[in-house]
Amino acid sequence: MIYKVFYQETKERSPRRETTRTLYLDIDASSELEGRITARQLVEENRPEYNIEYIELLSDKLLDYEKETGAFEITEF
């Protein structure tokens, strides 16, 4: 399953929509909840300075759209 993680690069400032970044993770999980938990743990372990805002499971249609926009790249830690 592919998850899209919305985050701020620092926890020092209040979140602003204009500075929200995204990354994509390929998580092997048996449920959506397990995948979200695993995604959060991966990001927090590897990028503790990131302020995670939201984690979204991508549907097939949304994944295709993300690939078409050119912004899609799986992050590996």
Curated annotation (Swiss-Prot):
Assembly and interaction partners: RNAP is composed of a core of 2 alpha, a beta and a beta' subunit. The core is associated with a delta subunit, and at least one of epsilon or omega. When a sigma factor is associated with the core the holoenzyme is formed, which can initiate transcription.
NCBIfam families: PRK13667.1
Swiss-Prot/TrEMBL catalytic activity: RNA(n) + a ribonucleoside 5'-triphosphate = RNA(n+1) + diphosphate
Descriptive protein name: DNA-directed RNA polymerase subunit epsilon
Annotated organism of origin: Streptococcus pneumoniae serotype 2 (strain D39 / NCTC 7466)
Family as reported in the entry's similarity comment: Belongs to the RNA polymerase subunit epsilon family.
GO terms under cellular component: DNA-directed RNA polymerase complex
InterPro entries xref list: RpoY (IPR009907)
Keyword annotations of the record: DNA-directed RNA polymerase, Nucleotidyltransferase, Transcription, Transferase
HAMAP family assigned to the protein according to its UniProt record, in alphabetical order: RNApol_bact_RpoY
One function term, GO molecular function aspect: DNA-directed RNA polymerase activity
